[in-house]
Amino acid sequence: MPESITPIAAAAPASRALLADGAEQVFWETASTTEFETPVDREMFQWRYFGYYLEREPELLFVATEGDTVLGYICGVADTRAHRELYEVAPHVAVFDDLYDRYPAHLHINLTAASRGRGLGGRLVASLESAVAARGAGGMHLVTSPGARNVRFY
């Protein structure tokens, strides 16, 4: 069965809940941090990198599926500065504030290990790029680190 990419906000309510659950499962499967001092720390980590986008910008959360299986997702915002709450929950957001005139949009993307290397990540990025461009974003940024497994992808 071929892969499909669905904006979560466009899915029927029952499907949307299943897609959100599947995307959150991918989030935890691929998370760079898996151990937390407290349950609140774990919740904040999830909120910072996934839950915020699901709640605040569902139109910019795209889920890749094959049949009923969620393979990955991409989420983001078209204008980082318009999301002031991110400055509070993710302090690193303020570090790059001087770049947001040129690159206002940002993203988070995660794919299961089995779905990498098939072009799906590029298709997810293209979906989000089109959506943020339609909202007037002239550029998109992301943050990673030199040793991260995603460097080669970007």
Question: Which stretches of residues belong to each language-model region?
Answer:
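Active-site rim helix/loop that mediates acceptor-substrate recognition in acyltransferases
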Residues: 37-61, 66-67, 75
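Conserved GNAT acetyl-CoA-binding A-motif
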Residues: 103-105, 109, 132-145
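Conserved acyl-donor/pantetheine-binding loop and adjacent beta-alpha core of acyl/acetyltransferases
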Residues: 75-109
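Hydrophobic alpha-helical core bundles mediating ligand binding, dimerization, or RNAP-core interactions
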Residues: 20-31, 45-49
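Conserved active-site alpha-helix within GNAT-family acetyltransferase domains
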Residues: 107, 118, 122, 134, ...
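Glycine-rich acetyl-CoA-binding "A-motif" of GNAT/NAT acetyltransferases
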Residues: 69-72, 149
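Conserved N-terminal entry element of GNAT/NAT acetyltransferase domains
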Residues: 1-18, 29
